[in-house]
Regions:
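Interaction-mediating elements
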Residues: 23-145
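Bacterial Sec-dependent N-terminal signal peptides
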Residues: 1-25, 39
Protein backbone atom coordinates (compact mmCIF):
# COMPACT_ATOMS: atom_id res chain seq x y z
CA UNK A 1 0.00 0.00 0.00
CA UNK A 2 2.85 2.39 0.83
CA UNK A 3 4.48 1.68 -2.55
CA UNK A 4 1.25 2.43 -4.39
CA UNK A 5 0.80 5.67 -2.47
CA UNK A 6 4.44 6.62 -3.13
CA UNK A 7 4.13 6.00 -6.89
CA UNK A 8 0.83 7.86 -7.00
CA UNK A 9 2.40 10.88 -5.29
CA UNK A 10 5.38 10.78 -7.68
CA UNK A 11 3.02 10.65 -10.66
CA UNK A 12 1.01 13.61 -9.37
CA UNK A 13 4.15 15.70 -8.77
CA UNK A 14 5.51 14.89 -12.24
CA UNK A 15 2.17 15.66 -13.86
CA UNK A 16 1.87 19.02 -12.11
CA UNK A 17 5.46 19.89 -13.05
CA UNK A 18 4.86 19.01 -16.69
CA UNK A 19 1.70 21.10 -16.86
CA UNK A 20 2.99 23.97 -14.76
CA UNK A 21 4.69 25.85 -17.56
CA UNK A 22 3.69 25.66 -21.17
CA UNK A 23 4.80 27.91 -24.01
CA UNK A 24 2.56 27.85 -27.02
CA UNK A 25 2.60 29.90 -30.19
CA UNK A 26 -0.44 32.09 -30.73
CA UNK A 27 -1.48 34.76 -33.22
CA UNK A 28 -1.21 38.48 -32.65
CA UNK A 29 -5.01 38.60 -32.46
CA UNK A 30 -4.93 36.34 -29.40
CA UNK A 31 -2.92 38.89 -27.40
CA UNK A 32 -4.76 41.03 -24.86
CA UNK A 33 -6.09 44.24 -26.42
CA UNK A 34 -3.59 46.40 -24.51
CA UNK A 35 -0.69 44.45 -26.04
CA UNK A 36 -2.17 44.73 -29.53
CA UNK A 37 -2.55 48.49 -29.12
CA UNK A 38 1.02 48.78 -27.80
CA UNK A 39 2.42 46.93 -30.82
CA UNK A 40 0.37 49.05 -33.22
CA UNK A 41 1.53 52.26 -31.49
CA UNK A 42 5.25 51.55 -31.17
CA UNK A 43 6.12 48.77 -33.60
CA UNK A 44 3.67 49.00 -36.51
CA UNK A 45 6.59 49.24 -38.96
CA UNK A 46 8.13 45.93 -37.78
CA UNK A 47 7.33 42.41 -38.93
CA UNK A 48 6.26 39.96 -36.22
CA UNK A 49 7.92 36.54 -36.49
CA UNK A 50 6.63 34.87 -33.31
CA UNK A 51 3.97 35.45 -30.69
CA UNK A 52 3.81 33.04 -27.78
CA UNK A 53 1.86 32.66 -24.59
CA UNK A 54 3.59 31.27 -21.51
CA UNK A 55 1.20 29.84 -18.97
CA UNK A 56 2.59 29.13 -15.52
CA UNK A 57 0.61 27.82 -12.58
CA UNK A 58 -0.21 31.31 -11.31
CA UNK A 59 0.07 33.60 -14.34
CA UNK A 60 0.16 34.14 -18.08
CA UNK A 61 2.74 36.14 -19.96
CA UNK A 62 3.19 36.89 -23.63
CA UNK A 63 6.31 37.30 -25.76
CA UNK A 64 6.43 38.94 -29.17
CA UNK A 65 9.53 38.61 -31.35
CA UNK A 66 10.06 40.80 -34.40
CA UNK A 67 12.14 40.03 -37.51
CA UNK A 68 14.88 42.50 -36.50
CA UNK A 69 15.37 40.76 -33.14
CA UNK A 70 13.34 43.19 -31.05
CA UNK A 71 11.42 41.41 -28.28
CA UNK A 72 8.55 42.62 -26.13
CA UNK A 73 7.22 40.84 -23.06
CA UNK A 74 3.74 41.50 -21.70
CA UNK A 75 2.02 40.48 -18.48
CA UNK A 76 -1.35 38.73 -18.47
CA UNK A 77 -3.20 42.04 -18.80
CA UNK A 78 -1.21 42.99 -21.89
CA UNK A 79 0.95 45.63 -20.20
CA UNK A 80 4.57 45.60 -21.34
CA UNK A 81 7.15 44.42 -18.83
CA UNK A 82 10.27 44.32 -21.01
CA UNK A 83 11.39 45.66 -24.36
CA UNK A 84 14.77 44.73 -25.83
CA UNK A 85 16.34 45.49 -29.18
CA UNK A 86 19.19 43.87 -31.10
CA UNK A 87 19.65 46.94 -33.28
CA UNK A 88 18.56 50.48 -32.60
CA UNK A 89 17.04 51.81 -29.42
CA UNK A 90 13.96 51.30 -27.30
CA UNK A 91 11.27 53.86 -28.21
CA UNK A 92 11.93 56.96 -26.09
CA UNK A 93 8.27 57.28 -25.08
CA UNK A 94 8.61 54.06 -23.07
CA UNK A 95 11.34 55.50 -20.87
CA UNK A 96 10.18 57.65 -17.93
CA UNK A 97 11.22 61.29 -18.29
CA UNK A 98 13.40 61.28 -15.16
CA UNK A 99 15.37 58.29 -16.46
CA UNK A 100 15.74 59.82 -19.94
CA UNK A 101 17.04 63.05 -18.41
CA UNK A 102 19.51 61.19 -16.20
CA UNK A 103 20.87 59.10 -19.07
CA UNK A 104 21.18 62.01 -21.50
CA UNK A 105 23.06 63.98 -18.83
CA UNK A 106 25.38 61.26 -17.53
CA UNK A 107 25.67 58.95 -20.54
CA UNK A 108 25.34 61.25 -23.55
CA UNK A 109 25.50 59.39 -26.84
CA UNK A 110 24.36 56.07 -25.36
CA UNK A 111 21.08 54.51 -26.37
CA UNK A 112 18.77 52.32 -24.32
CA UNK A 113 18.70 48.85 -25.86
CA UNK A 114 16.62 47.17 -23.12
CA UNK A 115 14.13 48.36 -20.54
CA UNK A 116 12.40 46.21 -17.95
CA UNK A 117 9.83 47.46 -15.51
CA UNK A 118 8.82 45.85 -12.28
CA UNK A 119 6.64 47.11 -9.45
CA UNK A 120 9.28 49.06 -7.55
CA UNK A 121 12.06 49.50 -10.10
CA UNK A 122 13.00 49.97 -13.72
CA UNK A 123 16.13 48.46 -15.24
CA UNK A 124 17.71 49.75 -18.44
CA UNK A 125 20.64 48.45 -20.43
CA UNK A 126 22.66 50.98 -22.38
CA UNK A 127 24.43 50.45 -25.70
CA UNK A 128 27.78 50.49 -23.85
CA UNK A 129 26.69 47.43 -21.82
CA UNK A 130 25.97 49.19 -18.52
CA UNK A 131 22.82 48.12 -16.71
CA UNK A 132 21.23 50.84 -14.60
CA UNK A 133 18.51 50.24 -12.02
CA UNK A 134 16.17 53.03 -10.95
CA UNK A 135 13.59 53.09 -8.17
CA UNK A 136 9.96 53.97 -8.86
CA UNK A 137 10.80 57.68 -8.48
CA UNK A 138 13.49 57.51 -11.17
CA UNK A 139 16.43 57.68 -8.78
CA UNK A 140 19.47 55.57 -9.69
CA UNK A 141 19.92 52.75 -7.16
CA UNK A 142 22.37 50.38 -8.88
CA UNK A 143 24.86 50.10 -11.74
CA UNK A 144 26.01 46.76 -13.10
CA UNK A 145 28.72 46.25 -15.70
Amino acid sequence: MKKILFFLMCFIVLHISACASADKPITKENLPQAAQTFIQTYFSDKTITLVKQDTDVARKTYDVVFADGTEVEFNGKGLWTEVSTKTGAVPQDLVPETIRTFISGKYAGQTICRIERERAKTEVKLSNGLELTFNKDGRLIDIDN
